[in-house]
Protein backbone atom coordinates (compact mmCIF):
# COMPACT_ATOMS: atom_id res chain seq x y z
CA UNK A 1 0.00 0.00 0.00
CA UNK A 2 1.25 3.42 -0.99
CA UNK A 3 -0.72 6.61 -0.37
CA UNK A 4 0.52 9.80 -2.03
CA UNK A 5 -1.00 13.26 -1.64
CA UNK A 6 -0.27 15.97 -4.18
CA UNK A 7 -0.44 19.65 -3.35
CA UNK A 8 0.36 22.74 -5.38
CA UNK A 9 -1.26 25.77 -6.91
CA UNK A 10 -3.37 25.91 -10.03
CA UNK A 11 -1.33 24.84 -13.05
CA UNK A 12 1.56 23.42 -11.02
CA UNK A 13 1.35 19.90 -12.47
CA UNK A 14 -0.78 17.98 -9.96
CA UNK A 15 -3.04 16.55 -12.65
CA UNK A 16 -0.06 15.62 -14.82
CA UNK A 17 1.62 13.88 -11.88
CA UNK A 18 -1.56 12.03 -10.91
CA UNK A 19 -2.16 10.92 -14.50
CA UNK A 20 1.37 9.55 -14.69
CA UNK A 21 0.93 7.60 -11.44
CA UNK A 22 -2.37 6.19 -12.69
CA UNK A 23 -1.41 5.40 -16.30
CA UNK A 24 2.14 4.20 -15.76
CA UNK A 25 2.21 2.83 -12.23
CA UNK A 26 -1.34 1.58 -11.68
CA UNK A 27 -2.33 4.00 -8.92
CA UNK A 28 -5.98 4.63 -8.14
CA UNK A 29 -6.94 8.30 -8.08
CA UNK A 30 -9.28 9.65 -5.46
CA UNK A 31 -9.54 13.35 -4.89
CA UNK A 32 -11.04 14.95 -1.84
CA UNK A 33 -13.26 16.93 -4.23
CA UNK A 34 -14.69 13.91 -6.12
CA UNK A 35 -18.07 13.95 -4.33
CA UNK A 36 -18.19 17.76 -4.57
CA UNK A 37 -17.55 17.69 -8.32
CA UNK A 38 -20.25 15.08 -8.88
CA UNK A 39 -22.76 17.06 -6.82
CA UNK A 40 -21.97 20.40 -8.47
CA UNK A 41 -22.04 18.83 -11.93
CA UNK A 42 -25.61 17.72 -11.28
CA UNK A 43 -26.75 20.78 -9.34
CA UNK A 44 -25.42 23.35 -11.82
CA UNK A 45 -25.78 21.17 -14.97
CA UNK A 46 -22.07 21.52 -15.70
CA UNK A 47 -20.30 19.61 -18.46
CA UNK A 48 -17.35 17.29 -17.92
CA UNK A 49 -15.16 19.95 -19.54
CA UNK A 50 -16.30 22.58 -17.04
CA UNK A 51 -15.50 20.26 -14.13
CA UNK A 52 -12.50 18.26 -15.34
CA UNK A 53 -11.23 20.25 -18.33
CA UNK A 54 -8.48 22.77 -18.86
CA UNK A 55 -7.84 25.74 -16.59
CA UNK A 56 -9.50 27.93 -19.22
CA UNK A 57 -12.64 25.77 -19.29
CA UNK A 58 -12.87 25.82 -15.48
CA UNK A 59 -12.40 29.61 -15.42
CA UNK A 60 -14.89 30.48 -18.19
CA UNK A 61 -17.94 32.29 -16.79
CA UNK A 62 -21.20 30.39 -17.25
CA UNK A 63 -23.93 32.79 -18.36
CA UNK A 64 -26.63 30.36 -17.19
CA UNK A 65 -25.36 30.96 -13.65
CA UNK A 66 -25.00 34.74 -13.77
CA UNK A 67 -21.42 34.69 -14.97
CA UNK A 68 -20.06 32.52 -12.17
CA UNK A 69 -17.18 30.23 -13.20
CA UNK A 70 -17.27 26.50 -12.49
CA UNK A 71 -14.14 26.92 -10.31
CA UNK A 72 -15.89 29.54 -8.15
CA UNK A 73 -18.95 27.28 -7.82
CA UNK A 74 -16.79 24.41 -6.60
CA UNK A 75 -14.80 26.62 -4.24
CA UNK A 76 -17.87 28.19 -2.67
CA UNK A 77 -19.93 25.03 -2.29
CA UNK A 78 -16.95 22.96 -1.14
CA UNK A 79 -15.39 25.39 1.32
CA UNK A 80 -17.89 28.05 2.25
CA UNK A 81 -20.93 25.75 2.50
CA UNK A 82 -19.83 22.16 3.15
CA UNK A 83 -16.44 22.47 4.84
CA UNK A 84 -17.26 25.49 6.99
CA UNK A 85 -20.91 24.87 7.90
CA UNK A 86 -21.78 21.16 7.76
CA UNK A 87 -20.55 20.80 11.34
CA UNK A 88 -23.67 22.74 12.36
CA UNK A 89 -25.82 19.67 11.67
CA UNK A 90 -23.12 17.04 12.22
CA UNK A 91 -21.36 18.09 15.44
CA UNK A 92 -17.89 16.61 15.64
CA UNK A 93 -17.33 16.66 11.88
CA UNK A 94 -15.58 20.04 12.13
CA UNK A 95 -14.05 20.93 8.74
CA UNK A 96 -13.46 17.29 7.84
CA UNK A 97 -16.31 16.40 5.46
CA UNK A 98 -13.93 15.53 2.63
CA UNK A 99 -11.36 13.67 4.73
CA UNK A 100 -14.16 11.77 6.48
CA UNK A 101 -15.59 10.74 3.11
CA UNK A 102 -12.12 9.64 2.00
CA UNK A 103 -11.56 7.66 5.21
CA UNK A 104 -14.76 5.65 4.63
CA UNK A 105 -13.86 5.03 0.97
CA UNK A 106 -10.24 4.14 1.79
CA UNK A 107 -11.19 1.73 4.56
CA UNK A 108 -13.44 -0.13 2.11
CA UNK A 109 -10.70 -0.19 -0.55
CA UNK A 110 -8.08 -1.52 1.89
CA UNK A 111 -10.39 -4.34 2.95
CA UNK A 112 -10.82 -5.36 -0.69
CA UNK A 113 -7.27 -4.67 -1.87
CA UNK A 114 -4.72 -4.03 0.90
CA UNK A 115 -1.93 -3.56 -1.67
CA UNK A 116 -3.65 -0.77 -3.59
CA UNK A 117 -1.67 2.36 -4.38
CA UNK A 118 -3.68 5.58 -4.14
CA UNK A 119 -2.98 9.15 -5.20
CA UNK A 120 -4.94 12.11 -3.84
CA UNK A 121 -4.52 14.88 -6.38
CA UNK A 122 -6.01 17.88 -4.59
CA UNK A 123 -4.58 18.51 -1.12
CA UNK A 124 -5.43 22.15 -0.28
CA UNK A 125 -5.90 22.42 3.48
CA UNK A 126 -3.76 21.67 6.54
CA UNK A 127 -6.31 19.17 7.88
CA UNK A 128 -6.05 17.25 4.59
CA UNK A 129 -2.24 17.20 4.76
CA UNK A 130 -2.39 16.07 8.40
CA UNK A 131 -4.90 13.37 7.47
CA UNK A 132 -2.63 11.92 4.77
CA UNK A 133 0.28 11.85 7.21
CA UNK A 134 -1.96 10.19 9.84
CA UNK A 135 -2.66 7.39 7.34
CA UNK A 136 1.08 6.92 6.71
CA UNK A 137 0.96 8.72 3.38
CA UNK A 138 3.62 10.67 1.53
CA UNK A 139 2.92 14.32 0.74
CA UNK A 140 4.41 15.92 -2.37
CA UNK A 141 4.32 19.66 -2.99
CA UNK A 142 4.63 20.59 -6.65
CA UNK A 143 6.07 24.02 -7.37
CA UNK A 144 6.05 25.45 -10.86
CA UNK A 145 8.04 28.69 -11.07
CA UNK A 146 6.29 31.40 -13.02
CA UNK A 147 2.82 30.13 -12.13
CA UNK A 148 1.55 32.45 -9.43
CA UNK A 149 -2.00 32.57 -8.16
CA UNK A 150 -3.72 35.76 -7.17
CA UNK A 151 -6.73 33.74 -6.02
CA UNK A 152 -7.72 34.84 -2.53
CA UNK A 153 -10.13 32.00 -1.82
CA UNK A 154 -9.26 30.20 1.45
CA UNK A 155 -8.56 26.96 -0.45
CA UNK A 156 -5.74 28.68 -2.36
CA UNK A 157 -4.47 30.84 0.51
CA UNK A 158 -4.17 28.03 3.10
CA UNK A 159 -2.43 25.82 0.55
CA UNK A 160 0.47 28.28 0.44
CA UNK A 161 1.06 28.00 4.20
CA UNK A 162 1.21 24.17 4.48
CA UNK A 163 4.73 23.05 5.42
CA UNK A 164 4.16 19.40 6.39
CA UNK A 165 5.02 17.96 2.97
CA UNK A 166 7.73 15.34 2.55
CA UNK A 167 9.32 16.75 -0.60
CA UNK A 168 9.02 19.59 -3.10
CA UNK A 169 9.12 18.76 -6.81
CA UNK A 170 10.12 21.74 -8.92
CA UNK A 171 8.30 21.42 -12.22
CA UNK A 172 10.49 23.61 -14.43
CA UNK A 173 12.16 21.22 -16.84
CA UNK A 174 11.00 18.68 -19.42
CA UNK A 175 8.07 16.36 -18.85
CA UNK A 176 10.48 13.40 -18.80
CA UNK A 177 12.47 15.01 -15.98
CA UNK A 178 9.24 15.70 -14.09
CA UNK A 179 8.25 12.04 -14.47
CA UNK A 180 11.68 10.99 -13.21
CA UNK A 181 11.15 13.09 -10.07
CA UNK A 182 7.77 11.42 -9.56
CA UNK A 183 9.35 7.94 -9.79
CA UNK A 184 11.89 8.93 -7.11
CA UNK A 185 9.06 10.08 -4.86
CA UNK A 186 7.20 6.80 -5.31
CA UNK A 187 10.37 4.92 -4.39
CA UNK A 188 10.70 7.04 -1.23
CA UNK A 189 7.03 6.56 -0.36
CA UNK A 190 7.30 2.79 -0.87
CA UNK A 191 10.22 2.60 1.55
CA UNK A 192 8.14 4.32 4.23
CA UNK A 193 5.62 1.45 4.24
UniProtKB/Swiss-Prot annotation:
Q: Which keywords annotate this record? A: ATP-binding, Kinase, Nucleotide-binding, Transferase
Binding-site residues for dGMP, renumbered to this chain: 10, 36-37, 58, 122, 124, 128, 155
Q: Does the keyword field hold Chaperone?
A: no
For the protein in the UniProt heading, the enzyme class is transferase
- Annotated catalysed reactions: a 2'-deoxyribonucleoside 5'-phosphate + ATP = a 2'-deoxyribonucleoside 5'-diphosphate + ADP
GO MF terms held by the record = ATP binding; deoxynucleoside-phosphate kinase activity, ATP as phosphate donor
Q: Does the keyword Methyltransferase apply?
A: no
EC annotation from Swiss-Prot or TrEMBL: 2.7.4.13
Q: Where does ATP bind?
A: 13, 16
Q: Which family does it belong to?
A: Belongs to the dNMP kinase family.
Name of the protein in question: Putative deoxynucleotide monophosphate kinase
- Source organism: Acanthamoeba polyphaga mimivirus
Amino acid sequence: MVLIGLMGGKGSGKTTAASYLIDRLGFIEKSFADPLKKACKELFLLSDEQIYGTQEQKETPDDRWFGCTPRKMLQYVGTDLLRDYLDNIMPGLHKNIFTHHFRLWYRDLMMKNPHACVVISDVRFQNEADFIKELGGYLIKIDRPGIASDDTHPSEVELRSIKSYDIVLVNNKTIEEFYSQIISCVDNASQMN
